[in-house]
Amino acid sequence: SSAASDVYKRQNNTIPGYTADIDNYFSKYREHKLISYIKKIREEQGIAYDAVPAATGCIEIKRGKVIIDPQCDASKISMIDSRWTEESFRTFVRLLNDFYRQTKFKDFYTLHRGLYDIAETRLNTILVDLNAEWFKSMFGEGPENTIVVASLCNGPGNYAFNGITKGEKRGIVIGCSTDKEGNPAYSRFLITVIVHELLHHYTNPCLAQYWSQIDSASQIIYPHVKEKMAKLAYGSTNSTMIEWFNNLLTIMYFKDNPNRGFTATHLTAWRQHEGFIWMERSMTFMEHFRNHRNLYSTIKDFMPEIVSFVNYTASDFDNVLKEYDNKAVSYTHLRAHE
C-alpha cells in the first residue's frame, strides 16, 4: 500500500479496474499498524520513491510469511539506501508480514493472476530484444540473474534495486501504461528504459569506485546544469554524474544495438536537451574505448580514462557551454518519445 500517498499514483497511467480492486479489497485494513507506520517513516525518514523498491531485494515470501531474505544482512540495509535503518526495516517487514496474513493477500493475488499474466507476456515481448551478451562484453557479466518486476500500481515509474553482496537479489521495477481495454501495456520505447535501469547495476559501482577522483570536477560541472537537473529530480552532484554516466552507457548500447525508431544520435540529442550538455563530447570520447577494445576488455579497465575525461571537461566547461549555445538544433521531434 502507498498509505494514502500520491507518490506512487499517476492518475492517467494506472490500471483503473485494478486500482479499484485494490481500494475495495484493502480499504477495511486502513487502520492496520503497517499503514500508520508507513506514514511515519515516510515523514520522518523520507521512505518514499526509490527507497521502497531499494529494499525489495531483501524481502521474500516463504511458507506463507513475509520475511527478510536470509541472504540479506539487515544490519547493512542503509548501504542499499541511506534512508533505511535496520530498526525501521525490521519493523516494516514484521508489520508487512502481519498485513499479508491478516488481509489474506495471496487470495487477492490469485484472483488477479490473469492480469499479471498479461503484463508478464507483454513485457517479455520487449525483453526478448535485449542483447544480454553486450552487457557481458562491456562489464564481464551479463544480466541473467537480474529480476524484472512488472509493477501495475505505480503508473510509469521505474526503479532499480541492488543487493550489497553477490548473493543478494538485484532487479528493476518497470511501470506500465494501459490499453483501451484497461490492461497493462508497454511501448516499444520502453526498451531504452529497461536498458537504462539494468545498466545502473553496473555503472553505479564503477563510478562509486572512482568518485573521489572526479568529485572536485563534478562540483564544477553541477552548478551549470543544476536547474535542469532539478527538473529531472536529480538534486545533487552525485546523482547528476551517476545519471550522466548511466545515460552515456545506455546510448552506447543503442549505438551497438540499433533499434528502429530511435538511434544513438537521437538519444544523445535528447540527453543534451535535458541538461547533460556534454553528452555529445562524451560519445565522441567513447570512440576511443570502442576502437581499442584490445586495450580495454571492459569498462572497468577504461575507468581511469573516464576520470581524465571528466576532469578535462570540467576545466573546459566554458567551451562546453559555448558549443551547446551555438547549436541550432530543434528538439521538437524528441518530445514525442518523452
List the predicted regions and their residue ranges:
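Active-site scaffold of zinc-dependent metalloenzymes
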Residues: 161-186
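Active-site recognition of the HExxH zinc-binding catalytic motif
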Residues: 188-208
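N-terminal accessory alpha/beta regions
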Residues: 10-86
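Conserved small/polar residues in nucleotide/adenosyl-binding loops
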Residues: 3-11, 331-338
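Pan-zinc metallopeptidase signature
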Residues: 250-330
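Auxiliary, metal-adjacent structural segments of Zn-dependent hydrolase domains
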Residues: 112-167
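Post-HEXXH active-site segment of zinc metalloproteases
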Residues: 205-229
